[in-house]
């Protein structure tokens, strides 16, 4: 057998073996993914609906800058693959609105969030991602504080205490790594 035919035969055999192995892995991964997806779906379903509560904001560690009423609603997007959280409140007496689009990446097993907010994000969109927690998830993103300045980090934790109580807490992360509570939303299901 000539060398190029032998090489071609070996390549086909290796490719077929790799494909077969990949199909086995994909079948196994698909089962694991379905379990994670169901868990994700169940979590999203518990969030659906209208919520109300208070939102606290800190601009300096330990120094409360604002405490205002907030209302929010979680709705499913694209048949429940994603969930949208839209909220309205006030910041130091001025109206404030924002939205998050939340998803669970079945490949990376990470929650992913995009966030826009009239006050906190100005005209930017923050992308965050992170791991599930026993009662929700925690994600981390970065945002710009000024031209030619190092980005600051932002960590958000969703904690679904029970079917009627949800706390969303966000922390500023300085470029040096120190963290400080920035925003805390304490929701209860609207009646």
Language-model regions, residue ranges each:
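Positively charged n-region of N-terminal signal peptides that target proteins for export
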Residues: 1-5
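Bacterial N-terminal signal peptides
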Residues: 7-17
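Hydrophobic small-molecule pocket/channel-lining residues, especially in calycin-type beta-barrels
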Residues: 22-191
